[in-house]
Each structure stands twice: as structure tokens, then as C-alpha cells.
Amino acid sequence: MARRRATPTKAPPDLDARVAELYGGPLPSFVTRRDALARELRAAGDREGAAAVKALRKPRAVAWALDAGAHADPGALDRLRAAVDGVVEAQGGAGDLRGALDELRRAEQDLVAAAVEAAAGHGRPVDRTAVGAALRAVVGNPEALADLLAVRLVDAEALPDPGLAPVAAPAAGRGRATGGR
């Protein structure tokens, strides 16, 4: 008897949102949920998307907390994005640097609070100081910042603390599940 191929179903409408849910969801089930999404994409006929999702790495705890906070409180993430943009503009001479840095500190505090709350809500409390230090390092690293803004940061602990280094604009084209990395 000939094997009948399953008819592919339609691919998820917004893969980026699904990946953000994956990174913002419970850490212990990350691999199970990632693999389920990859199977869903493969069943829908999206082999490229399935391979890209399957290749996604499980985040480390502090990076996951930042992702979870960003996913749970998109407003905090938007404020961080706006504050980073404000600092970059002010560093270029187009504004009040001190005011922009104050706004960045407030935005960082908001996202750290969201991360700590989201992690606790998932039953995985994290150290507020460690999350704050990690966020400062992320803000100073364009690739890591782009990943956080896309809610898919994997590792913040490996980043050096930038100290008083300038804030970097996020790298363009980073953080897509199916994009050309």
C-alpha cells in the first residue's frame, strides 16, 4: 500500500511573535516548546522555518529573565528602545545627554523590574542585581541589544560590562527566526 503524504497546513501567521512567546515562556519547557513549534512548521511545509526554529538555543537564566520581562511588558521594552535611541542621538550632539541617560536608567529599571516579576511568575526567581548588570551589558552590545529587542536574547552573562562605554544602536537585521543570519 502506498504511503500517503500529509497535506501541509498553513504556516503560523507570525513566526517572530511565536518565537518571542517561546523565549518569553517558561524556561524549563523551552526545548519541548521549541521542538513542537519546529514540528508544526515542518508539518505546514515550512522546512526552512522549522530548521531555523530547531536551531534556536535555549537561553541562559538571566537572558531568559530579560526575554520574559520584555515579553510580559512590551511597554518596558518600547521605553528601553526609545531611551537607547535618545542616548544615541544625544551622543551625536542632537540632544541633552544627561537627560537621555536619566531616561535610559529609568527604562532599564522598568525592564529589570518586569524581568524579575516575570521570572518569579514562572517560578524561577532571579537576582535583580545580576539582571541589571546583564541589561547594562546588553545595552552596550549592538547584537545583544537587537536580540533583546526581538525577545530572543540567549546569553547575557558572557557579555563584558561596558562600564561607561557609549550606548550602541541595535544591529540591523538581527533577531529574525527565518532571516538570513
Place the predicted regions along the sequence by residue:
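Exposed alpha-helical structural elements
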Residues: 14-18, 48, 52, 130, ...
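Amphipathic alpha-helical coiled-coil/helical-stalk segments
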Residues: 23, 69-70, 75-180
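N-terminal interaction modules that seed assembly of large macromolecular complexes
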Residues: 33-75, 86-94, 118-121
